[in-house]
Amino acid sequence: MKAVVLAVALVFLTGSQAWHVWQQDEPQSQWDKVKDFANVYVDAVKDSGRDYVSQFESSSLGQQLNLNLLENWDTLGSTVSQLQERLGPLTRDFWDNLEKETDWVRQEMNKDLEEVKQKVQPYLDEFQKKWKEDVELYRQKVAPLGAELQESARQKLQELQGRLSPVAEEFRDRMRTHVDSLRTQLAPHSEQMRESLAQRLAELKSNPTLNEYHTRAKTHLKTLGEKARPALEDLRHSLMPMLETLKTQVQSVIDKASETLTAQ
């Protein structure tokens, strides 16, 4: 029963046709990927559930109860498919329209990011160039000292370390200067990007189209509930005979077992 409830819930949430991922020629949106995954999962649940029902009916207890679960399971699957067909077009059309209406926001944000990237790139290139130059200069200064270290005796190690220390400090100071310079150069662009992003979010929040979609979403959910109610009622009616039969048969088995124990 848990598998049945999960299957119905997933169908209600996705409301899509059984479109498989490998049948798509064009790139899929995130919503399409979620719907495809849900459909594959629902199909797997239905198939595995039918296998369990078939195995139970084949068992000695299932044959004794004679519940006709497999037939009822197929009826349940048909009812679920009908529910999916009723809800699919309405839900798919709503989300597709919402994605189209908000596409301009993504385009504007990508445009802003590209503009900032073009402005910042020269500073990054200059920083990388200076970094490489200083690393090469440091390597040239250290190389002779390293050779001298190999040739000198242990007693000159401290003297050599003293000579290396100023070079390392000079390199560190130069790197700090470059980093501070880069931070100063990038600061206006970072602030500009934050302001641009805040502006885009404000535009998105105040956009009348999205406000309209908020209202339409409420209407859509209400309509969806009204359309789903008959299908769910049919599903409930399909399950009730099976549950009542199961309850009666199980009670009969319990009564017989009680009579047997009493007789002993």
Curated annotation (Swiss-Prot):
Pfam families: Apolipoprotein (PF01442). Keywords: Cholesterol metabolism, Glycoprotein, HDL, Lipid metabolism, Lipid transport, Lipoprotein, Oxidation, Palmitate, Phosphoprotein, Repeat, Secreted, Signal, Steroid metabolism, Sterol metabolism, Transport. Belongs to the apolipoprotein A1/A4/E family. Residues 1-18 form the signal peptide. This is Apolipoprotein A-I. Major protein of plasma HDL, also found in chylomicrons. InterPro entries: ApoA_E, Apolipoprotein_A1/A4/E. GO terms for biological process: adrenal gland development; amyloid-beta formation; blood vessel endothelial cell migration; cellular response to lipoprotein particle stimulus; cholesterol biosynthetic process; cholesterol efflux; cholesterol homeostasis; cholesterol import. Sequence repeats lie at residues 67-88, 89-110, 111-121, 122-143, 144-165, 166-187, 188-207, 208-229, 230-240, 241-264. It comes from the Eukaryota. GO terms for molecular function: amyloid-beta binding; apolipoprotein A-I receptor binding; chemorepellent activity; cholesterol binding; cholesterol transfer activity; enzyme binding; heat shock protein binding; high-density lipoprotein particle binding. Its main location: secreted. Participates in the reverse transport of cholesterol from tissues to the liver for excretion by promoting cholesterol efflux from tissues and by acting as a cofactor for the lecithin cholesterol acyltransferase (LCAT). As part of the SPAP complex, activates spermatozoa motility. The modification Methionine sulfoxide is found at residues 109, 193, 240, 242. It is found in: Secreted. GO terms for cellular component: cytosol; endocytic vesicle; extracellular region; extracellular space; spherical high-density lipoprotein particle; very-low-density lipoprotein particle. Residues 67-264 are annotated as: 10 X approximate tandem repeats. Homodimer. Interacts with APOA1BP and CLU. Component of a sperm activating protein complex (SPAP), consisting of APOA1, an immunoglobulin heavy chain, an immunoglobulin light chain and albumin. Interacts with NDRG1. Interacts with SCGB3A2. Interacts with NAXE and YJEFN3. Glycosylated. Palmitoylated.
